[in-house]
């Protein structure tokens, strides 16, 4: 696939203490914002230009006001497409997810432990560098699963890290990985090639109808490291159209666990295993039989 090469963004700048960064990231993720840079006394958040309007701005202010008691001042600036690689490479270091996984920058050498699985990532603006707790939680859950014969779909693939990890954990079937952001889909294609893994199909899919058409092809495991609002919308869809599939999800805050339990009960899923890190959780769920 060949997504567009030019992707303009809106940069939101929050001048806050660094000890609040993780909390702000958690809160802003509920608005579907997944791309951040941390600077001294300033948190930068990025979203596609096409998603920014007065309604989105007011929604963010309302969420911050409800969370913190007041809406902190932030600025919004237009950012033309540029060399995001240089931006990210200035901040990224290798990330040891566990004794099994090491995420590194592409084309750089690191000391690797025996039997450690290395994933090389060129993140650009895509989500899934290993720096966010949700990515680490998903990978730790995946380590414990027998993926060899699973037919896997990765929803909101970002950098493609989860699809790549599934292949490196021994999955033998074609994997479908898709995102609704053009730069993310493009980035995932690059990372799949960088890691020399075969049979990972990366697609730019924006409409729910396209997802449903693919779900009907009989997937065994759905990977969904996305935000609460999207999960609320698509989990019932997955339940209807992939009635036998397990779902491994993250992007849910710990304090939203009651919401998740209520949703799973309503759509007839059982929770197999939940793990936690910081303010985040990851849950492996499956249909009740």
Curated annotation (Swiss-Prot):
GO terms for biological process: methylation. It is found in: Cytoplasm. GO terms for cellular component: cytoplasm. InterPro entries: Ribosomal_L11_MeTrfase_PrmA, Ribosomal_PrmA_MeTrfase, SAM-dependent_MTases_sf. Pfam families: PrmA. It is an enzyme of class 2 (transferase). SUPFAM superfamilies: S-adenosyl-L-methionine-dependent methyltransferases. Gene3D superfamilies: Vaccinia Virus protein VP39. Its main location: cytoplasm. Methylates ribosomal protein L11. Belongs to the methyltransferase superfamily. PrmA family. This is Ribosomal protein L11 methyltransferase.
